């Protein structure tokens, strides 16, 4: 381990030129929450994002989309003066960024409440498939900006002038570090198509019909069976099942149990079978 024998000014070494082709960030359309310890390769992040979103915990990322509005507060210089001396910058105030979802979602709001005691990082994707994050000490790697807190907000019910809305508030752990180590790169593919989080689902056995089942959203009960159709009608996506069939006439699944109760496989296994975006409630 190298030890510095002399002190230098470090970050106070700077230049003030501007790019010959200035880059202007565009509208943020998706945010990706990641565990604090996760880093990613810039070279293949876009092609692996879907895999990361379906990975087994604790190596999973949590995409949230679609974002429709953005606002910010804080992140301003704080100053202090001693005696009759001039004011000096002592630091920067807490930065809170607020992202408004295009649509209200009760299930997402509920899940975000569970992050009260969690430490996370965040990566952003804009409308032009530009990815924003933070540099690491390893060339070619990046990670998300570190957050002190993540919490939901917005208007839960419709009023005379506004529809229900959901906001996601991101509180930065260290705004100086985030801004000074920022990095961005552009994907050649439509990475926003992969920026989809998972939805909790329940597997419900119907009272009518032998071994007839439905797959419905845990929050709200929306029936997903017909949407996934034959993808769920394969025994390879199920545990404790010897045979599976999708019935298009009534939008049900016929599952033949082997032992125990039929259950969907882990999201990482479902992803390999092209079943994306769902995880069975547990």
Question: Where are the regions a protein language model picked out?
Answer:
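Nucleotide and nucleotide-moiety/phosphate-recognizing core
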Residues: 168
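The feature marks long extracellular or luminal low-complexity segments
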Residues: 227-282
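Beta-strand-rich structural segments
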Residues: 206-226
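Extracellular/virion structural assembly segments
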Residues: 42-164, 173-190, 208
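Polar/acidic, low-complexity leader/linker segments enriched in S/T/G and N/D
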Residues: 1-62
């Amino acid at each position: 381990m190298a030890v510095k024998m002399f002190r230098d000014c470090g970050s106070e070494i700077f230049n003030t030129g501007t790019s010959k082709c200035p880059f202007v960030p565009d509208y943020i359309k998706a945010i990706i929450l990641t565990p604090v310890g996760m880093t990613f390769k810039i070279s293949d992040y876009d092609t692996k994002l879907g895999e990361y979103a379906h990975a087994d915990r604790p190596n999973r990322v949590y995409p949230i989309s679609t974002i429709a509005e953005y606002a910010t507060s804080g992140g301003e210089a704080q100053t202090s003066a001693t005696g009759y001396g001039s004011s000096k910058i002592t630091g920067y105030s807490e930065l809170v960024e607020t992202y408004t979802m295009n649509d209200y979602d009760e299930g997402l709001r509920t899940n975000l409440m569970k992050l009260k005691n969690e430490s996370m990082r965040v990566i952003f994707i804009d409308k032009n498939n530009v990815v924003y994050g933070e540099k690491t000490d390893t060339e070619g790697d990046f990670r998300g900006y570190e957050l002190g807190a993540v919490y939901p907000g917005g208007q839960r019910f419709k009023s005379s002038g506004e529809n229900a809305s959901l906001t996601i508030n991101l509180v930065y752990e260290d705004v100086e570090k985030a801004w000074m180590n920022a990095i961005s790169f552009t994907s050649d593919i439509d990475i926003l198509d992969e920026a989809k989080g998972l939805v909790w689902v329940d597997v419900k056995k119907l009272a009518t019909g032998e071994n007839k089942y439905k797959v419905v959203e845990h929050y709200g009960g929306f029936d997903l069976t017909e949407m996934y159709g034959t993808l769920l009608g394969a025994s390879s996506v199920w545990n404790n099942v010897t045979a599976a069939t999708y019935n298009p006439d009534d939008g049900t699944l016929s599952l033949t149990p082997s032992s125990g109760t039929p259950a969907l496989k882990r999201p990482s296994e479902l992803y390999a079978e092209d079943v994306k975006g769902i995880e069975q409630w547990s």
